[in-house]
Amino acid sequence: MSAPELKEHALVNALAWQGEKEESKATFLASVPSRSQVELWTWSLAVGESYVAEADAEGWQELIYVLEGELTIQFTDSSKTIAAGSSFIFASSVTYTYINSGSQVLKFIRNVVY
């Protein structure tokens, strides 16, 4: 399986490979076009902790995948809650806040694309 050619971002969530055992698999989660660079981050936030991010330059995007817990991303006029095992893509050229309002440590992967 190869990544589809996309002009815009896409949540794909497609099984790309399955091993002989059920636990062995690769899932293609999302795709975004990139002009320059992609960053891969791991994050963890303790219960009640938050991180306020400054707006990135126009054209920057983030792909989030939650490993454990539940991540809330607060934007100026809205919020998005992402459960463990789910992905979310957003333009990061706005101010936003990562929030762990759950009852366990939050762990997630963050890709920054620009």
For every predicted segment, state its role:
Residues T42, I89, S103-Y114:
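A short hydrophobic beta-strand segment most commonly corresponding to one strand
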Residues T76-S93:
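Short acidic-glycine-tyrosine-enriched beta hairpin
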Residues Y98-S101:
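Asparagine-centered strand-capping/turn motif at beta-strand->loop junctions
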